[in-house]
């Protein structure tokens, strides 16, 4: 299987803190790859580097086999990478449609082509099982529905590599089930997914591969049995 994303020896330092030390991982195309570790281990930092929000102090990033150095999220988005943040970045007083197309509005005759946007959003919603009402104000949506809007935002921009940063932190159990169903659907459509979490039970439910980060260092990125992973994490915590 081809490799969608490869990080080689990524390091990142802040004043007095080593956030990432020699972190490497490979994400296969069409898989869910979990990035696991305790709070403060450096999981989100390495993904912010991949997304262009921060620059690494060392290491290489390869996307679909091509070495890339992202200077901003715009460059990462252009390369087909999207990030669903833990804290949603939505305008409450805008509709679902307006939020999804914001900054990437289709135009016709120098005006926003809302008809074309609506058609595209409805098609994506059905294709990926992310049903939304394009005309509903975001302020009227529940947390799980808002997350769907965030996912559709990155898909609308052409992402085929999706980063989910602690996506279940604000969800109730039913919404977690719905999210995992959506993740499986995205994977079946060939999307590559990076799932950041510190919740082991959720990782075992959704992930095909796992990379463990402890105290800023990557300890394993190979495909392994779920039982092996559980034992390893439990032993290292003692």
Task: For each feature predicted by the language model, list its residue ranges.
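Single conserved hydrophobic/aromatic residue that forms the stacking wall/gate
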Residues: 218-238
